[in-house]
């Protein structure tokens, strides 16, 4: 499966099965950072990564994404945030919550920064297959050398909607194998075999489902974006990937208060942007990985609420 999308061979010795992508992230952070050390995190970002750093006693240093004609990563801002305590860069692309895809150039420059400063990279590319309009998400696999210090996180939860199975994997340099195997052994002792068999079936036979899933998400994205754009009050960049719309609504700067009002008064659930760190406040994250008819109803409810 790894060789097919990226067109290059992979060794099984570089892969470690984990209890979901979250355990892969937790193991990766334990490998690299300790108390008092720092990790650079482009934000808005999924908050669980910050939590994993805090468990290790490390500190997340937010580096805000630029918001011009699209969400984008400024490598100069990233490098400016490096200090003697910095140990790693975490990059989630395609990204939750913004749906932004880092360009090949942004990825290559991030890798160059890591090389110059001796940093590790944790590459969370779990939404890499869920892209729209014929776009391919660039990967660190496209630009890395065999000796680069990169840990890749993956999960079955997104592509194949297997969230409840709690299965993912960590791809790492093989010299880390003994340490990673011990961390798995001392925490969960491994992933249940029947879950691994389900994951194998998804990887070997799940392309048709993934194609259907992406097309359904694309239709839902278009319905949501078109419905909210017609209100004239909702501001957003159309997501290039993943299945989230990160938007702001004129007149509502407090995202938590807005999210509570939406669920109470319009019957639409949304995540407040403040939960995703610097750059998130004033936004909402709407998930459109649902049936298009449900998304159309959500857009209608929001439009009626805004009009009222």
Predicted regions and their residues:
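PLP-dependent class I/II
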Residues: 1-308
């Amino acid at each position: 499966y790894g060789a097919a999308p990226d067109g290059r061979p992979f060794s099984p010795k570089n892969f470690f099965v984990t209890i979901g992508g979250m355990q892969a992230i937790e193991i990766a952070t334990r490998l690299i950072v300790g108390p008092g050390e720092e990790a650079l995190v482009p934000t808005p970002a999924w908050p669980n990564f910050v939590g994993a750093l805090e468990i290790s006693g490390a500190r997340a240093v937010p580096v805000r994404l630029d918001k011009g004609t699209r969400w984008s990563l400024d490598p100069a801002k990233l490098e400016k945030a490096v200090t003697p305590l910095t140990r790693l860069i975490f990059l989630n692309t395609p990204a939750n919550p913004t749906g932004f895809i880092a360009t090949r150039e942004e990825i290559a420059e991030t890798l160059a920064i890591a090389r110059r400063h001796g940093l590790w990279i944790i590459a969370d590319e779990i939404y890499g297959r869920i892209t729209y309009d014929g776009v391919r998400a660039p990967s660190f696999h496209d630009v890395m050398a065999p000796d680069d210090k990169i840990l890749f996180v993956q999960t079955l939860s997104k592509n194949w909607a297997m969230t409840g199975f709690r299965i993912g994997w960590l791809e790492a340099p093989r010299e880390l194998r003994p340490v990673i195997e011990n961390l798995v052994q001392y925490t969960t002792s491994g992933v249940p075999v029947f879950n691994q068999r389900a994951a194998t079936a998804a990887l070997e036979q799940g392309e048709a489902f993934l194609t259907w899933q992406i097309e359904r998400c694309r239709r839902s994205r278009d319905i949501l974006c078109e419905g909210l754009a017609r209100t004239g009050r909702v501001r957003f960049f159309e997501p290039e990937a993943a299945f989230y719309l990160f938007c702001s609504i004129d007149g509502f700067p407090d995202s938590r208060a807005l999210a509570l009002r939406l669920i109470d008064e319009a019957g639409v659930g949304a995540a407040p942007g403040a939960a995703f760190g610097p750059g998130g406040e004033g936004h909402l994250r709407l998930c459109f990985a649902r049936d298009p008819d449900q998304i159309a109803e959500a857009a209608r409810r929001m439009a009626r609420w805004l009009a009222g």
